[in-house]
Amino acid sequence: MRINPTTSDPGVSILENKNLGRIAQIIGPVLDVAFPPGKMPNIYNALVVKGRDTLGQEINVTCEVQQLLGNNRVRAVAMSATEGLKRGMDVVDMGTPLSVPVGGATLGRIFNVLGEPVDNLGPVDTRTTSPIHKSAPAFIQLDTKLSIFETGIKVVDLLAPYRRGGKIGLFGGAGVGKTVLIMELINNIAKAHGGVSVFGGVGERTREGNDLYMEMKESGVINEQNLAESKVALVYGQMNEPPGARMRVGLTALTMAEYFRDVNEQDVLLFIDNIFRFVQAGSEVSALLGRMPSAVGYQPTLSTEMGSLQERITSTKKGSITSIQAVYVPADDLTDPAPATTFAHLDATTVLSRGLAAKGIYPAVDPLDSTSTMLQPRIVGEEHYETAQQVKQTLQRYKELQDIIAILGLDELSEEDRLTVARARKIERFLSQPFFVAEVFTGSPGKYVGLAETIRGFKLILSGELDSLPEQAFYLVGNIDEATAKATNL
């Protein structure tokens, strides 16, 4: 982190005494730049291409050095579109890595990968900036306290609870509800949490980014009248951006979150949607950088790139970063190298199932595939642990019996198995829940269910006290009292 002299614009910089090079080759988002002997930039240095295109419009493209090629050439990846660039254009070596604004000035604003505001609300105070490339905190700085982060979502809190200061992954294929779930978590946690949040939109739909911004303004998480009182900073590098921007926008968001943790000593929430696009952007430029592709065409540096990002997301003795990341699963294949590499870094995984989404059970969280390192009796307590295990056993038995039911029907099952199936179907429906952010689609008001209420509800179903109620009564309700009230109206 460094303190800069006041400027009115993050793009303003003194270009004297900088090394000057020229573009030698352009292949899509990748540029080769020739520098004079002895004036070579370092890896990760920012380069700025300045000039005019054929229409006389001003060009200002920032790139990041990735490779030193020999013959006084470097290979760099552009952070914005390279249309209008041509060979021979002047390139300025800024002498430092990309740096972005950090601190209270970022709250309530939307930034691009370079830390420039894109919300038409004027310039940002850039006196305090920080480079996007840093080392992870040292081992002795890490904090190892274990505590649960309550989300108000029944299936998550009961079966795969989140760790405060941990890393959580939401895994799912296309269209099963990752972004809706992340928006609900922002709604439930960011409001109740009271601290600051940073949202990194990595290679997702621009419309969803706009929806999220509007939602945050309506809910007061962003205070338009007094931006300093806002609780969130937004960093977007969406689908239409070049791969360089999508590859680095996650680091920009993380750098802003690290400042709140290390300097302001706060607990921070970091939302990333979608971490797969970070990997995808890396694979897009990897071949252009001359690297041999690895498994399924991914970059050979996949584990290194993921590790350098994920290891910085951690809790220190000063403050914590709790990170919730959506992970797109290509073709619903969890063994694909991108989701498989991400798994290794997470404390809890919430796996979304297309089968449950097809049944209309939302959130479509798979209760048997989702896991958490926090689900241990010494952390969550005996009652929570036992209830969660019984719920999983009941659902597992139901899954085993489904083939028999499909061939022979329910009547061929033993009395005990029929009871298990009936309770499992009630549990499956009770794991659904109306969301605040989906009210406009469903027409049902959203529900926040506390952990104690969640455990009480599932214990009642498992005990058999509610065996007489129809299973429809448990569908899309909050706590168990709502289910019993709904049953009287059916």
From Swiss-Prot:
GO terms for molecular function: ATP binding; ATP hydrolysis activity; proton-transporting ATP synthase activity, rotational mechanism. Pfam families: ATP-synt_ab, ATP-synt_ab_N, ATP-synt_VA_C. One of its GO terms (biological process) is proton motive force-driven mitochondrial ATP synthesis. Its EC number is 7.1.2.2. Produces ATP from ADP in the presence of a proton gradient across the membrane. The catalytic sites are hosted primarily by the beta subunits. F-type ATPases have 2 components, CF(1) - the catalytic core - and CF(0) - the membrane proton channel. CF(1) has five subunits: alpha(3), beta(3), gamma(1), delta(1), epsilon(1). CF(0) has four main subunits: a(1), b(1), b'(1) and c(9-12). It is a peripheral membrane protein. NCBIfam families: atpD (TIGR01039). This is ATP synthase subunit beta, chloroplastic. The modification Phosphothreonine is found at residue 6. Keywords: ATP synthesis, ATP-binding, CF(1), Chloroplast, Hydrogen ion transport, Ion transport, Membrane, Nucleotide-binding, Phosphoprotein, Plastid, Thylakoid, Translocase, Transport. GO terms for cellular component: chloroplast thylakoid membrane; mitochondrion; proton-transporting ATP synthase complex. Its main location: plastid. The modification Phosphoserine is found at residue 13. Belongs to the ATPase alpha/beta chains family. ATP binds at residues 172-179. It catalyses: ATP + H2O + 4 H(+)(in) = ADP + phosphate + 5 H(+)(out). Disulfide bonds: none annotated. It is found in: Plastid, Chloroplast thylakoid membrane.
